[in-house]
């Protein structure tokens, strides 16, 4: 009867395997390094196994800015190679060049006190290491299960590869750096210029450092010379109406505009306005204004009236008669062609006193209205040919009131500094608020609002232009 053999079962095979005779080959002769070496050789020849690829620069930038790793993991394809141990270094086949492009590697997980992290200055670049993702953790766990008892040998080999891989790294950023320092370090990885900016940001220069020398001594501060106020001692021909009136006090440093200098102006014989010519007067005419008086009086005029060296006689009591209407007519004719001309009226009384007024415009008839400006003034001429001006005080604007029956200069409070009737027979002078003048017909200085009458023996009107 033929003997039928039943198919072996898995339990039978397992039993046969357990009952196999002991092998004559001693397994103790194979070291753990040989087992790991055969495993590495298999990975090396496998077409699907590659060295740890350099991450995408764009992904690295996102990782450095602490974005979500899970979102990147979902977009990453599943690995097609068998799990292997967690890489703690760089494989010999993927060791980067000395001047490698920007790449990211992993943090060193070595806890051996005899293996400190290697810090070099290769390339003067700063390369930072991202955290592990979940794929690396799963691969590590699977590899530990497969290697089993070769864990110690793999750890030793990993330490050797770690030291080799750390030689290609530049600097490892401390993991305990504060969040703001890590953010600045991340920005510094782009270019060398960014690294310099990081040093400026993290170590700002003290504002006092720029003022110190290399010895630490402060630089001497440069003091600019302060401009001291200049004392003005010269007289000035320029003055406003207030300054002419004597009631204006100029600010400190104003060029010569002081009341003392304006009121104390004296004519010097060698002045720039020499000589002054008086024209229009006949030789037979008894003069009232002499050339010496004219030179002293010219120094008191406004600047624009000093530009000419020639004065023209418009009216003379000795030449044209005692008529106020004739005076108005002759002045009006001349003013048509000389509208900017000023007029000087000079009187000589029965005691030989000479006095008068200056108007910055022609003396014409204007019924019922005052006219003139602060440049106008009353004056007295001394026997030594000096001029004493009485300028506008600013209290009112009663400079001149000229009508058909009379003409007056200076007014206020019912008093007139100088007033003459139409025939020059009833004339008087008093202290008026407009000029605060002395009584003009008195030899000695006297102020009074009571009018003092005088007899007019001579009268002349001159044009300054």
From Swiss-Prot:
Bias-annotated ranges (Low complexity): 103-113
InterPro entries for the chain: TLDc_dom
Region named Disordered: 1-61, 73-119, 144-183, 202-223
Cell compartment(s), UniProt: Mitochondrion
Domain TLDc: 287-465
Disulfide linkage: none
Pfam family, one: TLD
GO cellular component: mitochondrion; nucleus
GO BP terms: response to oxidative stress
Biased composition (Basic and acidic residues): 148-162
Keywords for this protein: Mitochondrion
Mitochondrion recorded as keyword: yes
Bias-annotated ranges (Polar residues): 20-32, 165-179, 202-218
Domain of life the protein comes from: Eukaryota
Transmembrane segments: none
Role description: May be involved in protection from oxidative damage.
Family, similarity comment: Belongs to the OXR1 family.
Name listed for the protein in its UniProt record: Oxidation resistance protein 1
Source organism (scientific name): Cryptococcus neoformans var. neoformans serotype D (strain JEC21 / ATCC MYA-565) (Filobasidiella neoformans)
